[in-house]
UniProtKB/Swiss-Prot annotation:
PANTHER family: OVOMUCOID-LIKE-RELATED, SERINE PEPTIDASE INHIBITOR, KAZAL TYPE 2, TANDEM DUPLICATE 1-RELATED. Disulfide bonds join C5-C35, C13-C32, C21-C51. Coiled coil: none annotated. Keywords: Disulfide bond, Glycoprotein, Protease inhibitor, Repeat, Secreted, Serine protease inhibitor. This is Ovomucoid. SMART domains: KAZAL (SM00280). GO terms for cellular component: extracellular region. Glycans are attached at N42. The keyword Disulfide bond applies. The record marks A15, E16 as: Reactive bond 3.
Length: 51
């Protein structure tokens, strides 16, 4: 499972809650928050939902 993070990082993310669990075992609140981290820290998607 992958998430398309082209166009990231973004300076601001919305507050919508659609959790994704990163390979760093951290829960990200939505795709924007996840993709910002993915671009900066080379995190990949563990699974959809909370860790």
């Amino acid at each position: 499972v992958t998430v398309d993070c082209s166009g990231y990082p973004k300076p601001a993310c919305t507050a919508e809650y659609f959790p994704l669990c990163g390979s760093d075992n951290q829960t990200y609140s939505n795709k924007c928050a996840f993709c910002n981290a993915a671009v900066e820290k080379n995190v990949t998607l563990g699974h959809f939902g909370e860790c």
